[in-house]
């Protein structure tokens, strides 16, 4: 592995952000810059509802495990690295309540990132 020589008067960051190749920048970024940023877990929560006899019915589950064991909750869970939020919602609904939800019916409502809302750590959830 060759050592990169940074020209005089230029910061390491400036060199890699502006003058290096994209591959060199990404290699540097993953080693030098990325570790300084906290990383949240990303989850999805599905707000699934329907109308029955003129009333709105909301799909909730009862949590089987901690945290919030036995409490009512929206269907949801952690995203896998290989999926986007819509596919994560579709998978979680299928896993938790055995319902096949068409992707075209899934829309994003909001993102919740309130610090401390999940006792397991920093979690950002995408509500759909």
Predicted segments with their positions:
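N-terminal leader/linker segments that precede catalytic domains of diphosphate-processing enzymes
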Residues: 1-128
């Amino acid at each position: 592995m060759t050592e990169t020589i940074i020209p005089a008067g230029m910061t390491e960051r400036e060199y890699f952000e502006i003058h290096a190749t994209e591959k060199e920048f990404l290699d540097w970024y993953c080693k030098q810059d990325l570790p300084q940023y906290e990383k949240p877990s990303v989850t999805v929560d599905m707000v699934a509802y329907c109308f029955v006899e003129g009333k709105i019915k909301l799909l909730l589950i009862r949590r089987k495990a901690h945290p919030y064991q036995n409490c009512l909750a929206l269907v949801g869970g952690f995203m896998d690295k290989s999926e986007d939020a819509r596919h994560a919602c579709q998978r979680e609904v299928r896993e938790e309540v055995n319902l096949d939800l068409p992707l075209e019916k899934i829309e994003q409502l909001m993102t919740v990132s309130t610090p401390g809302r999940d006792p397991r750590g920093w979690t950002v959830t995408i509500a759909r």
